[in-house]
């Protein structure tokens, strides 16, 4: 969307590295429309799409070299997830009760799905007999259209056991839905799926309206993982439920939580062995 207004009238053979570099620098300045610069991640994604097109042009021998090579990009900012305490989670759910956000928040806190996976859920993904949820689709927005896609990796498709309280909530919600509505579990009033950005905006407005600590919707996934590991649930089980492609990814992301759990285990072992008979 940003590339065409900038370079749409430029002849392919005349597009130079220096032109793209100047454009990158301009994207890092405050936008007249929003008053804010684009994030480094957004700029990187824009350049990835442009570079892919230029790479194709090189393959077709339309240009000799990819003008997107050797560009200086802004450094990506490492985001530190914000985690709610159990008391804050309870307050969040209390504020959301009787609102359209209650069900998606319950799903997210109990299952820790990525946003696109959550929004792609349909009723046929829930097996009410076994209490199992099948995660196999991802909802994305392409050219302002909402579509579902298959996961990129095998670990992205998985089956998760649903906690009893959430399963009962899902049953009750399904019974209340009007016949003929779209099959999406998390949906707008007319039954249509949310666009990812508009859903995140709805969540941010909810937090602000209820004077709750600001977190990203994705942070709820980290909250789910932190709760699991703090309860002593095996990191391997957490990996499978979260859909991480490897055990090491789970260990790397949540090493700080695991250190705390390990210390608690050491303290319990110490108490069990030596509280009555100190060494």
Give the ranges of each region predicted by the language model.
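N-terminal DNA-binding module of tyrosine recombinases/phage integrases
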Residues: 1-21, 59, 172-185, 192, ...
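C-terminal secondary-structure termini that scaffold catalytic or DNA-interacting sites
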Residues: 94, 130, 143-157, 161-168, ...
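Catalytic-site neighborhood detector that most strongly recognizes the C-terminal catalytic loop/helix
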Residues: 75, 83, 139, 167, ...
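N-terminal DNA-binding recognition helix of tyrosine site-specific recombinases/integrases
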Residues: 2, 10-25, 29-70, 114-116
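Short, polar N-cap/turn motifs at the start of nucleic acid-interacting alpha helices
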Residues: 125-132, 233-253
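Basic, Lys/Arg- and aromatic-enriched nucleic-acid-binding interface segment
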Residues: 36-40, 44-46, 59-121, 128-129, ...
């Amino acid at each position: 969307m940003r590339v065409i207004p900038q370079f749409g009238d430029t002849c392919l053979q005349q597009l130079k590295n220096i032109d793209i570099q100047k454009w990158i620098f301009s994207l890092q300045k405050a936008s007249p429309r929003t008053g804010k610069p684009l994030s480094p991640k957004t700029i990187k994604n824009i350049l990835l799409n442009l570079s892919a097109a230029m790479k194709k042009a090189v393959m077709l021998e339309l240009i000799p070299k990819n003008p997107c090579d050797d560009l200086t990009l802004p450094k990506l900012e490492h985001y530190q997830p914000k985690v709610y305490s159990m008391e804050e989670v309870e307050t969040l759910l209390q504020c959301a009760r009787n609102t359209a956000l209650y069900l998606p928040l319950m799903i997210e806190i109990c299952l820790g799905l990525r946003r696109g996976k959550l929004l792609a859920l349909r009723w046929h993904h829930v097996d009410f007999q076994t209490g199992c949820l099948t995660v196999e689709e991802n909802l994305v927005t392409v050219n302002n259209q909402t579509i579902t896609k298959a996961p990129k990796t095998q670990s992205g498709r998985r089956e998760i056991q649903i906690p009893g309280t959430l399963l009962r909530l899902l049953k009750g919600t399904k019974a209340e839905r009007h016949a003929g509505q779209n099959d999406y579990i998390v949906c707008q009033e007319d039954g249509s799926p949310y666009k990812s950005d508009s859903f995140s905006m709805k969540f941010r407005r909810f937090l602000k309206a209820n004077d709750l600590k600001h977190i990203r919707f994705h942070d709820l996934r980290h909250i789910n993982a932190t709760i699991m590991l703090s309860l002593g649930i095996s990191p391997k089980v957490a990996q499978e439920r979260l859909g991480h492609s490897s055990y090491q990814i789970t260990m790397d992301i949540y090493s700080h939580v695991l250190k705390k759990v390990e210390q608690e285990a050491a303290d319990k072992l110490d108490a069990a062995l030596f509280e009555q008979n100190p060494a």
